[in-house]
Amino acid sequence: MTETQTAPLTDTRIMPVIHTLFRRELRLVGGLLRSVTAGDTARAAVVADHLDLVGTVLHHHHTAEDDLLWPLLLERVPDDLAPIVHLMESQHGRVEQLLGDITPLLAHWRRTAAAAERDAMAQLYDELYVALAEHLDAEEQRLLPIAARSMTQQEWERMGEVARAGTPEGQQFVVLGMIAYDGGPEGVALLMHGAPPPVRWLVPRLGTRAYRRHALRVYGTATP
């Protein structure tokens, strides 16, 4: 490589596509919870299962970043990362604090469908959405450009593999459909990058179908 040549940027475009899942689902949670009639434990269980799924996907997404993204960037480009380290840490901390507050309430509400717990959780989820949206915006605007020039494509894709491995058994197509819902054709193409043509054709359709069924059960509509 000559002095005028530079390494190609790593393609990080999939990250904002994945973030659409969290933005949409968490934006809807407050209203979803408040719509559950007090004492309706059957409905509470459906909603709680959905919130558990979204929370699990978010947890593994952040864990993969914490384990594979941050240590590598801090080692390679500490000066580039310095201006945003404290911001990202404080935002992550706030998100984890809210999730920690929600977890015991959700476990109890699943069994009781009590109005007080429902309303407390709805408020916490409203706060979580605001905190997470702020964090995702900062990550996309400030962190991804650093990652694109500091990581190899293999390192970047490894992080995605680790995050996906945490998807609950039997929910892979639902989660794929959640991501594809707002991702559009370009997002679906990024999700399926490198897959054989039959897989690129079939899997997104299975994901869309699975999320439609899931959304009908959770929201009462296939297009929440």
List each language-model region with its residue ranges.
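Small-residue-biased structural context
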Residues: M1-P224
